[in-house]
Amino acid sequence: TKLDKGKSEYISFKKLIKTFINLFKTNNHDIDSLKNIVKNYQDKYLLKIILDIFYLYEEEKNSTSSLDFDDLIIIATKILNIKYNYKYFKYIIIDEFQDTSLIRFNLAKTIIDNTGAILTAVGDDAQSIYHFSGCDLFIFLNLHKYINNLKELKLVNTYRFSQELIDISANFINKNPFQLDKSMH
């Protein structure tokens, strides 16, 4: 029915706006960033609607003293930038590093920069699956630009699959020009 279609479209639009806000915040932007974009962008009608919804979303969170996941990461990073009494960080381990967002990496980098902690990051660019939630494979692929004295250890042996299956999947994965070159055994 027409009513069901309208409800379905509303739910889809709501999800789209929520995804936009999440991706925007995950990439270290805030309302002021969006205001600047709206001000400087010629076709600003949709962005203005999103900005208004963003304001309402933030107001609702503030009125209920709520935080979303991205807020927690951003606030933790700000606290670590202000307070220097966290010298007890010696090591940071990040698993599934290929699925790290900019704000999550900034949190780890703040600790590393202020404590000299050693980062161990484990990941596989061929297994990156969270781009839809703001994770950025660029961070994984360019970690050497952000971490001094980076040492890379490649694990090339797997015992999960036959060599035939490994070769078939590697042939498929290696067709992607953005993947790291790798050979598996």
Q: Can you name each region flagged by the protein language model?
A:
Residues 12, 16, 48, 67, ...:
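Charged, alpha-helix-enriched surfaces in structured cytosolic catalytic cores
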Residues 127-185:
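Conserved coupling/interface region of RecA-like P-loop/ASCE motor cores
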Residues 1-60:
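Coupling/switch/interface segments within P-loop NTPase motor domains and analogous charged loops
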Residues 22, 74, 109, 167-174:
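Generic alpha-helical structural context detector
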Residues 1-8, 38-42, 61-65, 87, ...:
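Short, polar/flexible loop-turn hinges at active-site or ligand-entry regions and domain interfaces
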Residues 25-33, 116, 172-184:
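Proline-centered turn/helix-capping motifs that create local helix->coil transitions or kinks
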Residues 21, 95, 165:
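Residue-level signature of catalytic and energy-coupling elements of molecular machines
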